[in-house]
Amino acid sequence: MAPAPCGRSSQRVFHFGKGKSEGNKNMKELLGGKGANLAEMASIGLSVPPGFTVSTEACQQYQEAGRALPPGLWAEVLDGLRWVEEYMGAALGDPRRPLLLSVRSGAAVSMPGMMDTVLNLGLNDQVAAGLAAKSGDRFAYDSFRRFLDMFGNVVMDIPHALFEEKLEAMKKAKGLKNDTDLTATDLKELVSQYKNVYVEAKGEPFPSDPKRQLELAVLAVFDSWESPRAKKYRSINQITGLRGTAVNVQCMVFGNMGNTSGTGVLFTRNPNTGEKKLYGEFLVNAQGEDVVAGIRTPEDLDAMKDVMPQAYKELVENCRILESHYKEMQDIEFTVQESRLWMLQCRTGKRTGKSAVKIAVDMVNEGLVERRAAIKMVEPGHLDQLLHPQFENPSAYKDQVIATGLPASPGAAVGQVVFTAEDAETWHSQGKSVILVRAETSPEDVGGMHAAAGILTERGGMTSHAAVVARGWGKCCVSGCSGIRVNDAEKVVKIGGNVLREGEWLSLNGSTGEVILGKQPLSPPALSGDLGTFMSWVDDVRKLKVLANADTPEDALAARNNGAEGIGLCRTEHMFFASDERIKAVRQMIMAPTVELRQQALDRLLPYQRSDFEGIFRAMDGLSVTIRLLDPPLHEFLPEGNVEEIVRELCSETGANQEDALARIEKLSEVNPMLGFRGCRLGISYPELTEMQARAIFEAAIAMTNQGVQVFPEIMVPLVGTPQELGHQVALIRQVANKVFTSMGKTIGYKIGTMIEIPRAALVADEIAEQAEFFSFGTNDLTQMTFGYSRDDVGKFIPIYLAQGILQHDPFEVLDQRGVGELVKLATERGRKARPNLKVGICGEHGGEPSSVAFFAKTGLDYVSCSPFRVPIARLAAAQVLV
């Protein structure tokens, strides 16, 4: 009886009890995750305390009515209560047959700890006396005391501290350490004091009518949906589109009724390792919150075998039933009341990456799930964990966290602090592990960034230079850490009250953004045999190819090892920073006043480029390599510093005089360089630049072919906005190809295509496709130009936009499907109309983001290209879209 996807259900209250349920596991949207699973457990015959669920739709109606109960709902709740009373042979508010209730929230998506719970509802003076006659004074008044505290805090908004003060004062007066040491008389006195707290805090007495308690508790759960912490959690976890929370009203069962009672929490498999063995904790003579609050140290679940063998045996069987039923590892809460087992909750258990892969593979091998179902059991984030080093024990360093920035590139790094790229390279060459700390990074820092174990920056967002480069290399990076102040001159960094000097140890958690003092122990990436098995299943299912962005032979090899099927983006400019000789030659080319002098500088660069391409072609033997011609504005290749320093360095490196150097710098200076003299505009203005790069590519390709390497070069022209721009560059490249083929006596196949990163190019894609054999969407620049956001400055306002709901996601991290995605669709359709066999892919940062990859797969792209370390994640996302 799953609800229709549209419209509203007339039924708003659903009963459940052993063997009887009005709901099922498919009704999460209506009953919330907890309510749907309680109904399911009851319907398959497990011992679930009976109760009823008030639907998420009722919560939505309550919010829409300005926080007023919808007409008729209270009568339906009372009908539900009567059903539970008849089932249990007890009644709410009856001292002779007392029924106590728990009232819990439960949205369609698990939001642990985000909503409010009330236990032991239904107690007042008369019911407590009746309960004491049945179960003893201590139990009755301890339950009453807990209820007054919880109800006061959750429902009446009385600070928990006011109750805690009374409890601590009594323990101090009696010379006691633990709550459990209080006598029944002490607890009765506490009940009296807690009631006074209501009068003092609210000016009214505690509501002793149990039905009024129930009504107020239901309203409190509805209200908690809009509490600041719940809204914040939904925002952080990008949870949208839910109706509200359901309310689960359930008969209380007690684990604190002596040594034949207890409570526990377990996972049906180990959530850290995936081992097929129950993993959990158990407390004798305790209520559920005692485990959660850590008041007493729980015992390992195995201890339950000895003290409650029958209940343990039933629990093991229930776990088997639930795993077989849900076909997933389960997280279970249970209580034993006087030797009788009760199942309180089950949900899919959260797990580590290592555990997720092992459980998926094991369940297929056990015949529990099919391979396609197993592919859905592993989240992209799980693979991310497996591919980066992690801290051995993150909880151990919590008191050493001195700042938190943006988690720009996952993993963990430990090293000695250095402040310049040069120092990072020097120290690294001496075998030292370093953390490069910069105010912000620039392309000139890439050598030091590559040498560093991790990168920490004061400024810059999740898509800043540091973040993008670090992710590409699988390096840990924490960016935009506003709590730090970097002083390059003195080589110190101030972090909060700490001052760290060069050489001091620092640890970074790129998955959380934490900056940690000292040298924390690391464990290497856990690449197990199960991962290889799992990824082979992934590759059998997916249709979308996954390529990698790689600029060096080392990157290309890493990409291939991670399952890349080619190189979708090789950025030639990164090669120019690889050595001093190269960057000097680039600067001579920039400073050259004549074509002849510029050609001389390019001739010096040619062998470097050719050798790099040979290395990449060799690493990618048998696979395609897409090489992007020079893209960034030329000023990025100039030295850093003030104008005088730049002029001095250029003069010494290139032999130019000061006047010429200054004039050249002024000419290269741009108001908006990202929209300025870059991309194909450089190749058109300086055709010899395109000629040199094309020649290096073709000469390298033929040299490798002569060595028996299979080479498939694809040349990509960047920042094209008109078909004429592309036509100019295509003609030039073909001329160079013919010259090289003639001089080397050999011909090879190659393709020429373009980046689609200017909105106009997407709109005239049909005309551009007449010249281009492939399109590759540069979604970083396409997003920048479509939104009109500067990628380097969005950090100033994106957090505000996300907090206020103006944007749901940072568009540089998650593709904006409605706007930028529409341009991708349009360009793909128009391009293929003009050239039906047009190869279409994407090489922006979005190529490794799971929801974006799913969109590209649905849109009919041939491939995505992402950083080498995100290749397995993109492979998984491409498969998950089809299962």
Curated annotation (Swiss-Prot):
Reaction it catalyzes: pyruvate + phosphate + ATP = phosphoenolpyruvate + AMP + diphosphate + H(+)
Functional note: Formation of phosphoenolpyruvate, which is the primary acceptor of CO(2) in C4 and some Crassulacean acid metabolism plants.
Gene Ontology BP annotations: photosynthesis
Name listed for the protein in its UniProt record: Pyruvate, phosphate dikinase 2
PROSITE patterns: PEP_ENZYMES_2, PEP_ENZYMES_PHOS_SITE
Further remark: PubMed:1668653 shows the existence of a second gene coding for both cytoplasmic and chloroplastic isoforms of PPDK.
Domain of life: Eukaryota
Gene Ontology molecular-function annotations: ATP binding; kinase activity; metal ion binding; pyruvate, phosphate dikinase activity
Species in which this protein is naturally found: Zea mays
Any Gene Ontology CC annotation: cytoplasm
UniProt xrefs under NCBIfam families: PRK05878.1, pyru_phos_dikin
Binding-site list for Mg(2+): E757, D781
The keyword Nucleotide-binding is annotated on this UniProt entry: yes
Binding site for substrate: R571, R628, E757, G778, T779, N780, D781
Region (Disordered): 1-21
Family to which this protein belongs: Belongs to the PEP-utilizing enzyme family.
EC numbers, comma separated: 2.7.9.1
Subcellular localization(s) per the UniProt record: Cytoplasm
InterPro entries: ATP_grasp_subdomain_1, PEP-util_enz_mobile_dom, PEP_util_AS, PEP_util_C, PEP_util_CS, Phosphohistidine_dom_sf, PPDK_AMP/ATP-bd, Pyruvate_phosphate_dikinase
Organs and tissues of expression: Expressed in leaves, roots and stems.
Keywords, comma-separated and alphabetical: ATP-binding, Cytoplasm, Kinase, Magnesium, Metal-binding, Nucleotide-binding, Photosynthesis, Transferase
